[in-house]
Design a protein with these regions (language model features):
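Conserved GNAT acetyl-CoA-binding A-motif
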Residues: 106-119
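A short, internal acetyl-CoA/4′-phosphopantetheine-binding micro-motif in the GNAT/acyltransferase core
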Residues: 83-90, 118-119
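Conserved acetyl-CoA-binding loop-helix of GNAT-fold acetyltransferases
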Residues: 91-104, 130
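Short hydrophobic/aromatic beta-strand or adjacent loop that forms the aromatic wall/cage
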Residues: 47-49, 143-147
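Acetyl-CoA-dependent GNAT
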Residues: 3-5, 13, 17-81, 86, ...
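Conserved beta-strand-loop-alpha-helix junction that forms the acyl-donor binding cleft
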Residues: 116-125, 141-143
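Conserved acetyl-CoA-binding loop of GNAT-fold acetyltransferases
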Residues: 129-138
């Protein structure tokens, strides 16, 4: 079935909060960030992890991408802890689609800004700046990564 102005091979995708039952799949997606399974479990239970699901697959299929955020409610901020896309699906814009949806969810929860860190000139920095993140004027990180911020 093809809908108007939609490529028939582009799957229908849904951004949703990650379910604890899918913790192992989320940890696998975020393992290169690197976030270990213990940290992923903490982020899923106490902060926010969102996933991108392919609606053309069975409901038990693992998500195709995941993004984890540390939520700081008193400050009204979230920090992007990491984002991961299934290896065989990279380079198709899924990270951008996931982050765009995640940012809308965070805004709906009342958060006011999202912070992130990325290597200058790297793919992560390129992704973040393409969706509106800008350099944070604060001090540079000791590991050389740039601090970025996006007001919601």
């Amino acid at each position: 079935m093809m809908t108007r102005d939609r490529d028939p091979v582009t799957p229908l995708l849904l951004v949703r909060r990650a379910a604890v039952a899918g913790e192992r799949d989320v940890a696998a997606l975020l393992s290169e960030v690197p976030l270990d399974a213990v940290e992923v479990a903490d982020l899923m239970r106490h902060h926010r992890v969102v996933v991108l699901s392919d609606l053309t697959l069975p409901s038990a299929a693992p998500p195709v991408a995941a993004a984890a955020f540390r939520i700081h409610r008193p400050a009204g901020t979230a920090e992007l802890a990491g984002i991961g896309v299934a290896v065989h699906l990279r380079g198709r814009g899924l990270a951008s689609r996931l982050l765009t949806g995640a940012l809308m969810l965070l805004r709906a929860e009342g958060l006011e800004r999202v912070q992130a860190c990325a290597a200058p000139g790297g793919a992560g920095a390129s992704l973040l700046t393409s969706i509106g993140f800008t350099a944070d004027g604060g001090t540079a990180r000791a590991d050389g990564r740039a601090r970025l911020v996006l007001p919601l």
